[in-house]
Amino acid sequence: VLAIVPYIILQFKGLGIIVSEASYGSISSTAAIWIGAISLTVYLMISGIHGSAWTAIVKDIMIFIVVLFLGIYMPFHYYGGLQPMFEAVHQANPTFLTLPKTGLSISWFISTVMLTVLGFYMWPHTFNATYSAENENVFRKNSIISPIYTLMLLFVFFVGFTALMQVPGLQGAEADLSLLRLSIQTFDPWIVGFIGAAGLLTALVPGSMLLMAASTSLSKNVYGVLVPSATGKQISILAKCFVPVIALVSVYFTLYGGNTIVTLLLMGYSIVTQLFPAFIFSLMKNNIVTKYGACAGIVAGIASVMYITITETTLGTLFPALPQIIKDTNVGVISLFINLVVLMVVSLATKKIAAQPHFESGAVDGKQIL
């Protein structure tokens, strides 16, 4: 849930930006966030996962059309082609298309991608999508279609490169406005509205899945454990009650937080990646990790992520004498390392306790406990 909240904030921030810009400022970002949060909460409580699934289909089709069109049209409209666009960007800023030697360097990029990949399937809403699949053929189709999403990023980059020259001066959080600002100065309002509608769905669909995953996790994995006598119906009702609560918390941090969309996404991934070590060990036949070790490692990893994020700590500030290539490594690696160390130490210390029949392993009613 701690990892999901920054991700929900990301969706609300994007929603506010899209509505405000697409309406040419007639609707404020704050009003858009509140309207979106309320609509999303009501929509989710009524329709559930099936409503989100059908909306996702419409969203995917619209966003594919918009991204493909903008990625091809923008470079040719402003520069006459892709090569002239890259030449113009290089002439204006020769180092823009390369990673810097320090800071956000190659080592930072590689380590960030690694952490993101490890955390991708740790998101609860990803598991929801997996478990709700009709049959195994759905996974085969997704394996074929999924690379298209990666290909779409190429056209997003083209739009970004175009905006670099045509919408200059966007610094910090304003960089999130680049696509819509460029669209507004290029197209008629009705086209901007279509682009905004596609963008709106890209915020609402993941937002609904995230809210559902967070509320379900709290009701089933927290309340359900604390109150074992709770029935499935009670847990289901409580999950719906958690939806507006989580939405309100997310709206608060959306309005009073200053992080950019990319920063929020990376922070969420840094937190959820802490589930990866315990998950991998759980798949092993001879699992040496105990539930105490897994929980301790996750808590230690998340605590270090929160501390690092709040204090803006980097490997360079912790170990200034290290080579630059190591200092630039994503600091989330430290949290993952702390997680692994604590996980192994606590597991070894509690191995004898966990081996007792009434704990992690053994038989209850003739069934093996995993």
Where do the PLM segments sit?
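Membrane-embedded helix-loop-helix hairpins and adjacent transmembrane boundary segments
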Residues: 1-370
